[in-house]
């Protein structure tokens, strides 16, 4: 926000096989910003590529209101057209669910008397979502064991916690015009995640679990790479393409 009638967004488009841009205060001062690329682990190399190589578009959007920035088609027009002929399964939507209660300590991720993602509690969120036109209900901590890559980590993201009847919850959601959103916490162990994601996503497709939220809580991806460096950008692209194979949002 520059003033009451002037809003500016600095962003990028067609970020493909390249490091994400970040902005920081310029050493020159005078309220100016400097652009910098998220580097590879050695902190010196930003992008590894052979020429010719396309760089992302850098965008500046200007509008008289925040809504004007959202309505702009600039970034969409600078991205390549969608590769998929049929995108009817893509469903932009809102979601609520078992999440914040875990962060404030009201409920717990893992099993026990305070476990948040139990059948009764998730159905309570489904009722709320149905009454408020919210399309999905997320349940963090719905599967057995902890996040992937931790002691006792889940090997699959498929087996539900002892106090969650997954079939009952998914069916109840559909009966009320809501869908269940599965959570996958990788703990940044993305190489391990790659080994199992076909099995996981196939299970979701077969059981009408059409959306996921993937977490990357931890230090660096695969204990090495910055989240928004070139390696991370390519990993996220691979993940999106993999979920698309199974018609998962």
Placement of each model-derived feature along the sequence:
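N-terminal accessory beta-strand-rich subdomains and adjacent acidic, glycine-rich linkers
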Residues: 1-82
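A mature extracytoplasmic/lumenal domain signature
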Residues: 12-14, 63, 100, 141-143, ...
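Generic recognition of flexible, low-complexity loop/linker segments
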Residues: 45-48, 124-126, 200, 239
């Amino acid at each position: 926000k520059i003033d009451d009638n002037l809003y500016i967004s600095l962003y990028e488009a067609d970020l493909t096989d390249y490091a994400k841009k970040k902005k920081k205060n310029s050493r020159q001062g005078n309220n100016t910003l400097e652009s910098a690329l998220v580097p590879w682990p050695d902190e010196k190399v930003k992008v590894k590529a052979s020429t010719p190589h396309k760089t992302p578009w850098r965008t500046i959007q200007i509008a008289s209101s925040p809504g004007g920035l959202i309505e702009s088609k600039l970034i969409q027009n600078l991205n390549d057209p969608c590769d998929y002929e049929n995108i009817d399964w893509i469903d932009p939507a809102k979601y609520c669910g078992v999440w914040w209660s875990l962060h404030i300590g009201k409920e717990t991720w893992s099993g026990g008397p305070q476990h948040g993602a139990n059948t009764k509690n998730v159905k309570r969120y489904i009722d709320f979502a149905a009454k408020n036109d919210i399309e999905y209900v997320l349940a963090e901590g719905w599967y057995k064991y902890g996040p992937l890559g931790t002691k006792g980590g889940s090997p699959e993201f498929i087996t539900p916690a002892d106090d969650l009847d997954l079939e009952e919850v998914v069916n109840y959601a559909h009966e009320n015009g809501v869908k269940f959103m599965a959570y996958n916490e990788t703990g940044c162990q993305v190489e391990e995640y790659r080994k199992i994601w076909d099995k996981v996503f196939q299970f979701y497709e077969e059981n009408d679990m059409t959306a996921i939220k993937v977490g990357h809580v931890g230090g660096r991806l695969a204990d090495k790479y910055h989240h928004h460096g070139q390696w991370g950008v390519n990993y996220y692209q691979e993940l999106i393409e993999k979920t698309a194979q199974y018609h998962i949002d």
